[in-house]
């Protein structure tokens, strides 16, 4: 197909719609987990530096990501523990966000520490070497 001024915008819209359809699911793989780890480390640093704006953005990202992870594992068999870990970690990210929004960085730090432990606990069960 030759792209012209008329067909190019149509092709872009079709590509965007296809991308949106595929993005509904989440591929829980090493790249996603490394991204989560990076965001959690950034959140920990942002909370320690009392950077409310950056910390809130990281916490929101983790809340959204763990909702997707929970949904992903909820569709699989024999992953009830993974669903529980994802749900608990999502709640901890939400607690951190609430504390950040209240400028309670001590409570946010506690929530982030618990979040990190929750990640490690899940990895002890599910992470493959």
Please place each PLM-identified region on the residue numbering.
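The canonical Cys-X-X-Cys-His
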Residues: 115-127
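N-terminal signal peptide c-region/cleavage motif recognized by signal peptidases
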Residues: 13-21
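Extracytoplasmic c-type cytochrome modules immediately beyond a signal peptide or single-pass transmembrane anchor
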Residues: 22-116
